[in-house]
């Protein structure tokens, strides 16, 4: 009987078993989602965990992490103590990547080079025509984030640093006086 048990144990040890892979879920910032997708693809290819990351915005990712509906959250800015205090399972904050924020525009034939003050005035709706920037006379529509976003926080911090005329404040969400809002970067 002892020999049978040893043989049976050997059979289990030597028999190939379907590889059990860890699955992780995360949510948060859309800004780094492209690099995260690449990293998670490479990780899975190397037999690492499979990661499902939803680029829902920093604010939603933070909430999902606090609510324990995901394994990890990602944000463009670190959690504040009031949010850290809500986390019941432990927390490690790690800087993952850096990036830049740029003004994108769609106006063929317009070679735009904004000053910092012009950037502030476009974002605040003070400049609302391309003619004011040296381009053809047509309405300028400002597009901005509508969801809670670490990118918006970084952007509004820059606008405030650029000019004393910036009156919208700073943060993951501000009350934009003009424009069209959309989710994600």
Locations of regions flagged by a protein language model:
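Sec-dependent signal peptide recognition
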Residues: 1-7
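Flexible loop/hinge segments at secondary-structure junctions
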Residues: 20-185
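Sec/Tat signal peptide C-region and signal peptidase I cleavage site
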Residues: 14-20
């Amino acid at each position: 009987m002892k020999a049978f048990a040893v043989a049976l144990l050997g059979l289990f040890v030597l028999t190939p078993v379907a590889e059990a892979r860890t699955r992780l879920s995360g949510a948060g910032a859309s800004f780094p989602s492209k690099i995260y997708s690449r990293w998670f693809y490479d990780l899975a290819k190397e037999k690492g965990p499979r990661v499902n990351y939803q680029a829902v915005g920093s604010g939603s990712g933070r909430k999902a992490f606090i609510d324990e509906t995901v394994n990890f959250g990602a944000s463009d800015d670190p959690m504040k103590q009031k949010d850290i205090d809500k986390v019941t399972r432990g927390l490690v904050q790690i800087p993952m990547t850096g990036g830049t924020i740029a003004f994108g525009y769609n106006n063929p034939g317009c070679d735009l080079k904004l000053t910092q003050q012009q950037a502030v005035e476009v974002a605040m709706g003070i400049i609302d025509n391309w003619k004011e920037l040296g381009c053809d006379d047509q309405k300028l529509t400002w597009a901005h984030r509508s969801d809670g976003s670490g990118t918006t926080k970084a952007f509004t911090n820059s606008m405030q640093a650029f000019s004393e005329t910036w009156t919208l404040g700073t943060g993951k969400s501000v009350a934009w006086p003009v424009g069209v809002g959309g989710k994600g970067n």
